[in-house]
């Protein structure tokens, strides 16, 4: 990035030939990943009057929360990480990525990509259980695959909703309770 914390500028470079749609998609994803699509001002307003927290704004002004590359990854990661340690959750995520994800390459460097719903089309409960998922987490993961794969859940649909509507929709999904819906 360029600019300053007060006036940040995000620079994105894409190698190779790309269509304008691909460039727009890549830019949107980078903005999502590095968190620049959100406005931190409401957060600053909440913590500004609390001395113990206002130091966060002073020390980390301009910092944005990073996000996963897709809503599917975000929600799946939230479900996988429930009621287990961060290390175990990261291990499950890694195993799912290694077994079902794709490999992207940039400048000769390979990157493991979290699977898309269609990458999990042949996965079944036993397959996911063999990776260490519990019965329920395997069921929930496949349920999310089906919801996203069928188009019932889309990022554009969620982006058009306010927070309360998103939370209501999330609570309809198996594996997501009030705490997870609010966290997401």
Residue ranges and their predicted role:
Residues 1-184:
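HhH-family (HhH-GPD) DNA N-glycosylase catalytic core used in base-excision repair
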